Structure formats: structure tokens, C-alpha cells
Amino acid sequence: MLGVSKSEAVQFVKNAGLSRVAPGVYCSEEAWPDRLYLIQLRNRKIVFSHETALYLHGLSDRESKQPIVTVKRGYNASHLKKDNIEVHTVVEDWFEIGTTTAETSFGNIVRVYDKERCICDILREKKRMDIQVFQTAMNAYFKSRDKDIHKLMEY
């Protein structure tokens, strides 16, 4: 398609010292792969949520032990669970509410729920959460200058 044969591409990867980190994605051996970005590349129908989104928005100083994503109800997420990704499901009507993008610590852009949606999600599941993460996120949100209380109430 681009005028490069498969054998030429394979030879380039070998000569450049690249390693395959995902289908169609290669990294130099010195580079650290961006796990969240790789998950997003392989799974276009996910949105990072809960503690993962809180961390990406700067509402938590703790990165979650495992990435947390939300998918539409009915989506077969068994491959995500095998990759040690925590999966939440929502009805289709709620899936797109509050979707936005955020930058990973490696500078890549991934889909996440906005701060207000994250607050709603953690309020619904606060008994499941670490209390310190919950309190830190709530305090950080309500102290932030870019909070949108009207949007929060709408959600």
C-alpha cells in the first residue's frame, strides 16, 4: 500500500533494533512503552475511567494498580481482563457522556471521562474504592479552578 514490502519492513525493524509491543506498534529497546496508549490503540471502544482517569486528570497522585476502563454493555471484554485490565460496563446511552481526552505521562493522547463524570463514577462506587484515593480526588476536584459544578449536577 505504501510501496514497502513486508520483507523490507521486517528487515527495517530488525536493523533498527525495534521490538514489537503490539500489533503494528514497535519501540526501540531504550524506550519505555506507554501501556495506556497501547491499550487504547488495540481497543478503540474503551474509555479510561475511575482511578485511571482520576490520575490522568491530576485528581489523584496514585496510579491505579491496573488500568481501569469502561465499555458498553454487551462488549466482549474477556481479552481486556486477561491483560489484567479492570473493566466496568455501562448502558449504551451513558457510554459517551463525558468523554474527552487526556495526556498520558508519556505524552500520548487517550480517551478518558471528564472530571465530572469521574466524580459521579467514584461516588457510585465509593465503597469499593480506597478511601484515601476517594478523599484526595474529591478534595482536588472541589479545589480546582476548572471544575464545572453545573455539568456535575447535570450528570
Range-by-range predicted roles:
Residues 1-2:
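Polyanion-binding surface elements
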Residues 8, 13, 21, 25-154:
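Nucleic-acid-binding surface
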Residues 16:
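Glycine-centered, phosphate/nucleic-acid-interacting loop/turn motifs that mediate DNA/RNA or nucleotide
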